[in-house]
Amino acid sequence: GRSTVAALLSAGVTRDPPEPVAPESPDTPSSAASSLTDGLTFADNGVPAQTTAPTSSKGYTVVNGVYLKNSSGTELDADALSDGSFAAQLTDDGPQVLIVHSHGSEAYTMPAGQEYTPTGSFRTDNDACNVVRVGDEIAAALSERGISVLHDRTLHDVPDYNDAYPHSLASVEDYMEKYPSLVFVLDVHRDAVSDADGNQYKLVSAEEPHAAQMSFIMGNAYDGWQE
């Protein structure tokens, strides 16, 4: 179980990554379950929705409507980023994408009647209400498109939040060693946005159907970072 994994990692013992399998649990959709919005109903969780967009492109590299905030000192070529070609190639030779969660217990504000039992500030080990569920949906969507996915559902921030990144790094290194076919590693987190008065907002796109806004954080201190 996850408590056993956490104990092993805390003791400095690495685990052997499992074989790639479709996510399975009562709270986990199968890869066949997604047309991801078909038949879903959405309850208001009481957090006001807000669409945010930069009012100026100053300080950003803009690529096809995506705003890249570049604090690295490396100049980005918008034309090269938008030409549709990538050095990374996905093949059928093995798992291609690894999804992990350094902070797997990061949770979401639930509608009335669906509240979770908290295990920390805006955190829960209930995988139906934390960021692991988001990883399930990403894995299902990629699998539908023929991309082989591994989803590590370990709560690396349980029991000790401060050890989350060393634990998740150890997991990623284990997976990379066992599955050299992996091309992308996604460490999926939940963000939180609030105004100057501390009021929380959920960020959605203005277009229908509404969709949550996402950000990708990428370092450039390694080869292939633009892929």
Describe the residue ranges of each PLM region.
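Catalytic-site microenvironment of enzymes
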Residues: 1-185, 190-227
